[in-house]
């Protein structure tokens, strides 16, 4: 159903925002390579209602970015309603008079800050905070994984938080599908590699296929960051990243090393010699012993020995929060068939259709409510007409008036959320902005780097032992290198 939207335009970080005129700008929030975000107030709401409006930039400049946007739109719709995943309220796509696209706008749940800002602020956090945050991350992951989706870019900057410690996972642009069948799983080609500091070692080491364990590793890195106040593995490049992991976890056993898909990387690790493991209690002497036990299992080098999300939720460290009845799974698997589409015009039409479908999806309950309202009005009018025909004209019409007065109350609906547990909070105001200490951005994959013309002039030369890439590039691209 096509609905007319009256828009107005204002500036956000010197870029035009053309949005529904009922939304009034509050302030600029942030901007990056893929979008610009502001907060806005919905002027027609009975209560103060604010949202985050994100303008996705450069959506149709590259196939890679278009597919990333389409992926995020579909996933936010699929996961809509889970308490630990950011909620997409609405979306809009604005066209120029000539039919070209002006911008894609997402109207999302407004959260007060992200976890990177909280950690960077240095405000005192307690073990109760760590338990609550870790539990909420795992609840969100359980729901995501149950739909056969891997997030692939969990990091503090992608965890949105409110002052009451409510946490929500965001940014699904790098997500990908997962199958227990290795053959099917290998077909989910990735377009990006995840952020280096939180990237599981099996991705760098070219293990045979990704598993859900990669997100558990990232969550473990975040737990370590809670305990230490800084990233546990802060590599300046991918070789240094591997070195930092080995310096803490020690040299993996031979059975694990044999599963590394690159002989070049195997040789490098052997050349380092034996590296002893550093007990986590040495790194975090003041931490809860149960937190360290959970961390030990989340940061197992071998993904086959790493704790699962379900097991982690049952760990004693999280027992104060664990409630199986309040840890739902997604009712449907996510469909990744759109990933095989590579024609830009086809992808553009899919984005437009997704926006139209979502707008109808979120408006359907309102349309049904309006239909019920009209039906009730018609029934009331019919009843009043019948009463007037049956009763003398001088009969008091107080009952009808009372019915009309009560009518709005009968139709009133509550959008309130159950109150959160009040025990502790965080300071979410005047936090530091993202700076040079922010994790490096995920890099584009080799699939995108490959020349579209088939010209190999820009492909890096092979080195002496016949490998296509040097050690740094092998670790950076991991499994993607075999598709180059």
UniProtKB/Swiss-Prot annotation:
Stated EC number for the protein is 2.7.11.24
Residues passing through the membrane, by range: none
Q: Is the ATP-binding keyword given for this protein?
A: yes
The top EC class, named as a word, is transferase
Q: How is its activity regulated?
A: Activated by tyrosine and threonine phosphorylation by MKK1 and MKK2.
Q: State the signal peptide span.
A: none
Q: How does it assemble?
A: Interacts with RLM1.
Q: Indicate which residues the UniProt annotation says bind ATP.
A: 29-37, 54
GO terms under cellular component: cellular bud neck; cellular bud tip; cytoplasm; cytosol; mating projection tip; mitochondrion; nucleus
Q: Where is the composition biased (Low complexity)?
A: 383-392
The processes (GO biological process) annotated in the record are: cell integrity MAPK cascade; endoplasmic reticulum unfolded protein response; fungal-type cell wall biogenesis; intracellular signal transduction; IRE1-mediated unfolded protein response; pexophagy; positive regulation of division septum assembly; regulation of cell size
Name of the featured protein = Mitogen-activated protein kinase SLT2/MPK1
What functional role does this protein have? Answer: Serine/threonine protein kinase involved in a signal transduction pathway that plays a role in yeast cell morphogenesis and cell growth. This pathway seems to start by SMP3; then involve the kinase PKC1 that may act the BCK1 kinase that then phosphorylates MKK1 and MKK2 which themselves phosphorylate the SLT2/MPK1 kinase which itself then phosphorylates and activates the transcription factor RLM1. Directly phosphorylates BCY1 upon TOR complex 1 (TORC1) inhibition.
**Which reaction does this chain catalyze?**
L-seryl-[protein] + ATP = O-phospho-L-seryl-[protein] + ADP + H(+); L-threonyl-[protein] + ATP = O-phospho-L-threonyl-[protein] + ADP + H(+)
What does the entry's domain section say? The TXY motif contains the threonine and tyrosine residues whose phosphorylation activates the MAP kinases.
Q: Does the keyword Nucleotide-binding apply?
A: yes
Give UniProt keywords alphabetically: ATP-binding, Kinase, Nucleotide-binding, Phosphoprotein, Serine/threonine-protein kinase, Transferase
Question: PROSITE patterns from the entry?
Answer: MAPK (PS01351), PROTEIN_KINASE_ATP (PS00107), PROTEIN_KINASE_DOM (PS50011), PROTEIN_KINASE_ST (PS00108)
Region (Disordered) residue spans? 383-403, 426-464
Q: What cofactor is this protein dependent on?
A: Mg(2+)
Similarity comment text for this entry: Belongs to the protein kinase superfamily. CMGC Ser/Thr protein kinase family. MAP kinase subfamily.
Report which superkingdom the organism of origin falls in: Eukaryota
Q: How is it modified after translation?
A: Dually phosphorylated on Thr-190 and Tyr-192, which activates the enzyme.
């Amino acid at each position: 159903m096509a609905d007319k939207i009256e828009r107005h335009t204002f500036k956000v970080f010197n870029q035009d925002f053309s949005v529904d005129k009922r939304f009034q700008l509050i302030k600029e929030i942030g901007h990056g390579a893929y979008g610009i975000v502001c907060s806005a107030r919905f002027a027609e709401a009975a209560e103060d209602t604010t949202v985050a409006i994100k303008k996705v930039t450069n959506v149709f400049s590259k196939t890679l970015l278009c597919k990333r946007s389409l992926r995020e739109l579909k996933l936010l719709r699929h996961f809509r309603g889970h308490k630990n995943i950011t909620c997409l309220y609405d979306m809009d796509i604005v066209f120029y008079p000539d039919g070209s696209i002006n911008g894609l706008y997402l109207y999302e749940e407004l959260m007060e800050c992200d976890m990177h800002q909280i950690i960077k602020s240095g405000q005192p956090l307690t073990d109760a905070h760590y338990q609550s945050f870790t539990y909420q991350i795992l609840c969100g992951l359980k729901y995501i994984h149950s739909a056969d989706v891997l997030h692939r870019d969990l990091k503090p900057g992608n965890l949105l938080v409110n002052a009451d410690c409510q946490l929500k996972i965001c940014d699904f642009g790098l997500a990908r599908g997962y199958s227990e069948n290795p053959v099917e799983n290998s077909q989910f080609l990735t377009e990006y590699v995840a952020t280096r500091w939180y990237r599981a070692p099996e991705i760098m080491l070219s293990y045979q296929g990704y598993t859900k364990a990669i997100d558990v590793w990232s969550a473990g890195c975040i737990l370590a960051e809670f305990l230490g106040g800084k990233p546990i593995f802060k590599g300046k490049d991918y070789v240094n990243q591997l070195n930092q992991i080995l310096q803490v976890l020690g040299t993996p056993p031979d059975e694990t090393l044999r599963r590394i898909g690159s002989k070049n990387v195997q040789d490098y690790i052997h050349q380092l010699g034996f590296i002893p493991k550093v007990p986590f209690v040495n790194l975090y002497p003041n931490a809860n012993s149960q937190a360290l036990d959970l961390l030990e299992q989340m940061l197992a080098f071998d993904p086959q020995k790493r704790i699962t999300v379900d097991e982690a939720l049952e760990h004693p460290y999280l027992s104060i929060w664990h409630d199986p009845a309040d840890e739902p799974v997604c009712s449907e698997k996510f469909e990744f068939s759109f990933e095989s589409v590579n024609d830009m015009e086809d992808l553009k039409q899919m984005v437009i259709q997704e926006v139209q479908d979502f707008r109808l999806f979120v408006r359907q309950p309102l349309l049904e409510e309006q239909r019920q309202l009209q039906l009730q009005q018609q029934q009331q009018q019919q009843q009043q007409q019948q009463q007037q025909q049956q009763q003398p004209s001088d009969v008091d019409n107080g009952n009808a008036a009372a019915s009309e007065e009560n009518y709005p109350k009968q139709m009133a609906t509550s959008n309130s959320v159950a109150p959160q547990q009040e025990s502790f909070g965080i300071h979410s105001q005047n936090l530091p902005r993202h700076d040079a200490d922010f994790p490096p951005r995920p890099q584009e994959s080799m699939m995108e780097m490959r020349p579209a013309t088939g010209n190999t002039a820009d492909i890096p030369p092979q080195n002496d032992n016949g490998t296509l890439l040097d050690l740094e590039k092998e670790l950076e691209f991991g499994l993607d290198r075999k598709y180059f």
